[in-house]
UniProtKB/Swiss-Prot annotation:
One or more lysine residues are methylated. The keyword Protein transport does not apply. Pfam families: Ribosomal_L11, Ribosomal_L11_N. Keywords: Methylation, Ribonucleoprotein, Ribosomal protein, RNA-binding, rRNA-binding. Part of the ribosomal stalk of the 50S ribosomal subunit. Interacts with L10 and the large rRNA to form the base of the stalk. L10 forms an elongated spine to which L12 dimers bind in a sequential fashion forming a multimeric L10(L12)X complex. InterPro entries: Ribosomal_uL11, Ribosomal_uL11_bac-typ, Ribosomal_uL11_C, Ribosomal_uL11_C_sf, Ribosomal_uL11_CS, Ribosomal_uL11_N, Ribosomal_uL11_N_sf. This is Large ribosomal subunit protein uL11. GO terms for molecular function: large ribosomal subunit rRNA binding; structural constituent of ribosome. One of its GO terms (cellular component) is cytosolic large ribosomal subunit. GO terms for biological process: translation. It comes from Bifidobacterium adolescentis (strain ATCC 15703 / DSM 20083 / NCTC 11814 / E194a). The lineage of its organism: Bacteria, Bacillati, Actinomycetota, Actinomycetes, Bifidobacteriales.
């Protein structure tokens, strides 16, 4: 068995799918750890070309020999909720100002998409997490 590589950094970034480029903020974040920025951009864009227009979180593991691996996550719940509710952004005051609404079916659909990244045991628990995110954004959940 080959010896394990030593990890030098773990970066968590949210990048627009298919639009990774060496410009800030991505370039400086990767460059400071010695990663080949263009190589990462090409690999990330190729991996996310089918998800254009979405923000895809990525976890980049940088090793001491300057090589890297990355894991793509599911889009943020807030982004999926904004898309489902048809709004540009959430509210500053979710208690008094509601900006949109989503149905329980839409919440279930989002929870099923996010299940891999949620710390929930089943879809019902995942729905509660997504509904809580919706409430904090000023989005009401209707039957």
């Amino acid at each position: 068995m080959a010896p394990k590589k030593k990890v030098s950094a773990l970066l968590k970034l949210q990048i627009q799918a298919g639009k990774a480029n060496p410009a800030p903020p991505l370039g400086p974040a990767l460059g400071s750890h010695g990663v080949n920025i263009m190589d990462f951009c090409k690999q990330y864009n190729a991996a996310t070309q089918d998800k254009m227009g979405q923000v895809i979180p990525v976890e980049i593991t940088v090793y001491e020999d300057r090589s890297f691996t990355f894991i793509l996550k599911t889009p943020p719940a807030a982004a999926l909720l904004k898309k489902a509710a048809g709004i540009q952004k959430g509210t500053e005051n979710p208690l008094t100002h509601k900006v949109g609404s989503v149905t329980k079916a839409q919440v279930r659909e989002i929870a099923e998409i996010k299940m891999a990244d949620l710390s929930a045991r089943d879809v019902e628990a995942g729905m509660k997490i997504i509904a809580g995110t919706a409430r904090s954004m000023g989005i009401t959940v209707t039957d």
